[in-house]
Amino acid sequence: MADTDVIQGTLDMLILKSLSLQPMHGFGVTQRIEQISKGVFKVNPGSLLLGFQRLEREGLIDAEWRMSENSRRAKYYSLTSKGRKQLKLDTDDWQRRVAAIARLLEAEA
């Protein structure tokens, strides 16, 4: 795993979180993740596309074609109510796991 790879198993959650802020196209999601992580995470375009397809198939996001900011057709993704619920579950689970790892790392030998 490269230093900038998204942590395995978190891409769907990061996509859902990005879309919870506003509907956006794939490049916008990539930029959002890289911007908020301050460049720590880079998103592979192929992985992102597979993530969108998986989330749409599961009913967690919707997609529609629109004109982008630069007047080009782009597929915009938005969070469904089911997606919002899943994001909450994923976020709670992730925070629980991070707290457990922090406790393990801080434990005295």
Q: Where do the PLM segments sit?
A:
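Short beta-strand/turn micro-motifs at beta-sheet edges
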Residues: 1-5, 65-66
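N-terminal helix-turn-helix DNA-binding core of bacterial DNA-binding proteins
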Residues: 3-47
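Basic amphipathic alpha-helical segments that dock to polyanions
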Residues: 48-55
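Beta-hairpin "wing" of winged helix-turn-helix
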Residues: 56-73, 78
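Accessory beta->alpha helical hairpin/"wing" motif in late/C-terminal subdomains of nucleic-acid enzymes
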Residues: 79-83
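Amphipathic alpha-helical dimerization/coiled-coil segments
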Residues: 85-109
